[in-house]
From Swiss-Prot:
This is Small ribosomal subunit protein uS4. Signal peptide: none annotated. Disulfide bonds: none annotated. Part of the 30S ribosomal subunit. Contacts protein S5. The interaction surface between S4 and S5 is involved in control of translational fidelity. InterPro entries: Ribosomal_uS4, Ribosomal_uS4_bac-type, Ribosomal_uS4_CS, Ribosomal_uS4_N, S4_RNA-bd, S4_RNA-bd_sf. Keywords: Ribonucleoprotein, Ribosomal protein, RNA-binding, rRNA-binding.
Length: 204
């Protein structure tokens, strides 16, 4: 197992949830955290529930750093409308999230690696910033060279995940379009996400 896989599954174990719905997640075998006292789960406090909601969202999107995640919260609150919905939209506009949703990569971690190495084009131009904000109508494509990578082809052919309807994707060409921003109900999370609890956490 690679170090990246180990880190990913460590997140699952620590949070006690199968964040990405993966068959090999250790949570499928036991639903408690790591360590000697992992089975002793108390009923969480309001703060504990808010913290868990934050950790799940941060972890799901590839363990986003605290400073970056706080900036997303601040932007979500600044915008009009429901702050929790705004937060989800901001997260789903990240280029690494879009590449993952389009099934050009099997995990958010692999998506980030693909972008960092310059293998993703946005509107025909190379973008190597995973946090890049994708806009409605933007075209996302895997570079020609990377289309032959085994892990890219395997991800695109996988039947484990469906592509959500706020994206339009040609899986053969490994090219897609960001159609619109999703609401929370549109996003195919394998586990329940509670962005409003995240807003409450930072609003304390």
């Amino acid at each position: 197992m690679s170090k990246r896989q180990e880190a990913k599954y460590k997140i699952d174990r620590r949070l006690g949830v199968n964040l990405w719905g993966r068959a090999k997640s250790p949570v499928n075998k036991r639903e408690y955290g790591p360590g000697q006292h992992g089975q002793r789960r108390k009923k969480p406090s309001d703060y504990g529930m808010q913290l868990m909601a934050k950790q799940k969202l941060k972890g799901y999107y590839g363990n986003i750093g605290e400073k970056q995640f706080r900036r997303l919260y601040q932007e979500a609150v600044r915008r009009k409308g429901d702050s929790g919905e705004n937060l989800i939209q901001l997260l789903e506009r990240r280029l690494d999230a879009v590449v993952y949703r389009m099934k050009f990569a099997a995990t958010p971690f692999a998506s980030r690696q693909l972008i960092n190495h310059g293998h993703i084009l946005v509107n025909g131009r190379r973008v190597n910033i995973p946090s890049y904000t994708v806009k409605d109508g933007d075209s996302i494509e895997v570079r020609s060279k990377a289309k032959q990578f085994a892990f890219v082809m395997e991800a695109a052919a996988s039947g484990e995940r469906d592509i959500p309807d706020y994206l339009s994707v040609d899986s053969q060409a490994l090219k897609g379009t960001y159609v619109r921003a999703p609401g929370l109900a549109d996003v195919p999370y394998p586990v329940q996400m509670e962005p409003n609890l995240v807003i409450e956490f930072y609003s304390r």
